[in-house]
Amino acid sequence: MTISATMVRDLRDKTGAGIMECKAALAEASGDPEKAVEVLRKRGLKVAEKKAGRVAADGLVAAWTSPAGDVGALVEVNCETDFVARTEKFVGLAQRLVVLVAADPAAADVAALAERDLDGRRVADVVKGLIGSIGENIVVRRAARLALPAGVSGLVVHYLHAGGKIGVLLGLRCASDQGAKAEAVVKLAKDLALQVCSAEPAYVHRGEVPGDVLEREREILRAQPDVQGKPAAIQDKIIQGRLEKFYAESCLVDQIFIRDPEGKQKVRDIVAATQKAVGEAVSVVGFARLRLGDGVERRAAA
């Protein structure tokens, strides 16, 4: 059977596979486009298995927030090279996945996300198909989701740094829907998303710090040479003072606001000023931050 250019083009548009791959698949399938798709999928899955052992440390973090501003999501998708990370297919996959995560709280677990439906196929199979098409290992590594509690007014915003190297979600709680739309509140949300990106807090406020983390910090401080040997009451006073530095680094509202040119105002002061400006309570609901490649060991060039 003659394989026409139109048949090849249609199959390529449908699958994203290369011209020669489509032509060979159509020939093997005797011109049947549906069987040709199966041929490509089978080949893609085989290729994916061969690529799976490679280190995928590049890629991007995709971010999305709903038009209503009540939910947002982040997804980190890794590949092997920056070139692939900038391709339309790779970026498109990441953008579709992040919308899935926003719509489904359970999908923030990447194992659950792999089983979700995407264009009539399992996400895991879509990823494997793309591996076969692109020729690099691709890993959906992490996801995060942030939503306002049911019945709570506020907004969720996202911030992407350096073209997707870092992604941030930041949520604010307000007393009213009108307050959530106020210019000062929107500006605060965007500024705090930038703060989270730059200053890397671990908690919103000190009340969120787990007891075991605090105890470990106290043990570290108590073991320092200039603390040892002093009376217990003096040790406790010194340790408490130094814990304030820990809070100032680890807790968002205790951090120095990065947009303060004098470096004196804390984030809590900026939140209080915003409350005064809009005439109602405003507080931070939470945040999420993903940095591309955190914890992935990059293989040195040969």
Question: PLM features: residue spans?
Answer:
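N-terminal assembly/interaction segments in proteins that build large macromolecular machines
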Residues: 2-302
